[in-house]
Amino acid sequence: MDGSDGARRVLVINSGSSSLKFQLVDPESGVAASTGIVERIGEESSPVPDHDAALRRAFDMLAGDGVDLNTAGLVAVGHRVVHGGNTFYRPTVLDDAVIARLHELSELAPLHNPPALLGIEVARRLLPGIAHVAVFDTGFFHDLPPAAATYAIDRELADRWQIRRYGFHGTSHRYVSEQAAAFLDRPLRGLKQIVLHLGNGCSASAIAGTRPLDTSMGLTPLEGLVMGTRSGDIDPSVVSYLCHTAGMGVDDVESMLNHRSGVVGLSGVRDFRRLRELIESGDGAAQLAYSVFTHRLRKYIGAYLAVLGHTDVISFTAGIGENDAAVRRDAVSGMEELGIVLDERRNLPGAKGARQISADDSPITVLVVPTNEELAIARDCVRVLGG
């Protein structure tokens, strides 16, 4: 690909601690010229010792797809950054001052922001002549109503240490809400929606028009729904209890809640396909994990129906939401009195693309809407650069 088609493209990078995902996409058409992932960064015996090597490997993979970044019409590099704190909530062109401030904010997201910053620094060094733009997971939820954003703790402490509900997966929630409106051929501003982003990380949001009214994740991505490895909502006293009675340190408890809890903590597996196999074999732990997962999901759906007052549409998205028909069914079964009537003939496993899975006479429309965070980030980049 030599860029002779005149398309402008954005290289979107999602840099994690042990993996780097990338996609080269045309923000106008939505067509991806190349997409891939570099894994096992920094692991023992890995051929990818650090993020510099990872990005160079990504460039090799792009070249293998016939992409020459020098002639591909590249106009920007978009970086997914999980946490922008109270400072950054709009797509932001990266410079030394912005990066320095992001380093200061890393305490708010110690698991996510540092590897993103590593990816940014390497990408700026290897692609110095291109604009680099950060798009923040927390941005969409910056203007949550105070009643939803505020934790009922000592106000002085909260203000001093920027403790509030920030929310995450914001790029996905915004994109899916827009796509749902387009699918229904209805104005976005007139819709009240619940979006359920269900992947290894899971989050829910209640959205009125273009404004989110509530979301399940909080100061960090640990709060809310049960997830693949995260506990979601939990009594905060569990932390002090384990510290005092089990002799665990705070960091150990936090690591357990983030990496050894949720579905994997209850069942030993986090992949829902494997979980389903265990359930079918009669594994009680797997069944309990599934029941806890769907119970929490149903609680949030019910809560957000109340927050919105009137709901027009519920959208399932991300890996589990898009592909697991049983989760979708069990999330809303028995809610006919609340206005949700699923059509089992439409709620099929293996179906692709945006689709309706509720009955035609269901007061609340239920959709499956594939997310595309890379495309949303690419479009944000072009927008902030004035394209």
From Swiss-Prot:
Binding site residues for ATP: K21, H197, L198, G199, N200, G201, D271, F272, R273, G319, I320, G321, E322, N323
Q: How is the cofactor bound?
A: Mg(2+). Can also accept Mn(2+).
Subcellular location field: Cytoplasm
Q: Which residues bind substrate?
A: R80
> What reaction gets catalysed by this protein?
acetate + ATP = acetyl phosphate + ADP
In Gene Ontology terms, what is a biological process of this protein?
acetyl-CoA biosynthetic process
Supply the enzyme class, top level: transferase
InterPro entries named in the record: Ac/propionate_kinase, Aliphatic_acid_kin_short-chain, Aliphatic_acid_kinase_CS, ATPase_NBD
Per the UniProt entry, the Enzyme Commission number(s) are: 2.7.2.1
Q: Which pathway, metabolic or otherwise, does it act in?
A: Metabolic intermediate biosynthesis; acetyl-CoA biosynthesis; acetyl-CoA from acetate: step 1/2
The main location is: cytoplasm
UniProt cross-references to PROSITE patterns, sorted A to Z: ACETATE_KINASE_1
Q: Where is the active site?
A: D137 (proton donor/acceptor)
Give a Pfam family name.
Acetate_kinase
- Highest rank taxon of the organism: Bacteria
- GO terms assigned for molecular function: acetate kinase activity; ATP binding; magnesium ion binding
Listed A to Z, the keywords are: ATP-binding, Cytoplasm, Kinase, Magnesium, Metal-binding, Nucleotide-binding, Transferase
Report the cofactors: Mg(2+); Mn(2+)
Q: What does this protein do?
A: Catalyzes the formation of acetyl phosphate from acetate and ATP. Can also catalyze the reverse reaction.
Q: Which family does it belong to?
A: Belongs to the acetokinase family.
Q: How does it assemble?
A: Homodimer.
Against PANTHER family, the record matches this protein to: ACETATE KINASE, ACETATE KINASE-RELATED
What name is this protein filed under?
A: Acetate kinase
Organism annotation: Mycobacterium avium (strain 104)
Question: What gene makes this protein?
Answer: ackA
